[in-house]
Amino acid sequence: MSELRLSSEKRLRIFTGRAFPELAESVASELGITITPTSAYDFANGEIFVRFEESVRGSDAFVIQSHAAPVNKQIMEQLIMIDALKRASAKRITVVAPFYGYARQDKKHRGREPISARLMADLFKTAGADRLMVVDLHTSQIQGFFDGPVDHLFALPLLANYVGSKVDRSQLTIVSPDSGRVRVAERWSDLLGGCPVAFIHKTRDPLVPNESTTGRVVGDVQGKTCVVIDDMIDTAGTITKAVDALFNEGAKDVIIAATHAVFSGPAIDRLKNSRASEVVVCDTLPIPVENRFDGLTVLSIAPLIARAIREVFEDGSVTSLFDGHS
């Protein structure tokens, strides 16, 4: 025999950190596979240890970890998992970060500040990641920080289709909470039949995080059902002020729609006490039972992530998942 033929069969493996294993289980279920068994625990001093219980040699590995609080711990655990996979000879390693930590630190607002979103990308690459898969980055330019392919998925169709099924589209106005997300609002409008778009002019002090001053509403919202859209809800200050501003301008109803439910600090109380009739989010982050309330709707992001993983594994196309029109 003059040649040795190797098996060309590819092996897809899903791995999960401890931040949100329920999401990873849902993704694996959509793919019809199980999660690779992993041992992970903290030493007494807080250091993280990870070991995979099965061979990963030659596998196409997808490491799912949402960067929920405590953010730094979840990121470090994912980095350690990537390093372990690299040293165990995984063929390709894809970081799946449904919520990408430090995404708001994507540029320097003033001198002597870091660009932490870039540092994150460098850390993943150094650890051994070949590819990055994320959902609704705070700003799209973060894709350029990673030296390799980036699959930037959009939850917009999922959110828009849900909202569109609940309201009279002829009475709908899509509202951006600031001028920076008007383009996203326009894409919502396209998906929902060309409904009007408005935005709220606001100012923010770069020295005071999580605080903004809501200004005037730009656009006609009188008698309309308004959908305030954003990529995340952190302390909910911006978005609840937007709700108040819309009602002050004569809006008939307001729905809040956002991808990432960070829900820090006073967020739950603010949302519970807001005049919005419904808050719609995706499960890119875990939402504890105590943070759930009447009027909160949580949509599953697992089918979108599973579809993207399948396309990447099978060398298919994920373009429709990038452009937000899937």
Enumerate the predicted regions with their spans:
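PRPP-associated nucleotide enzymes
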Residues: 1-326
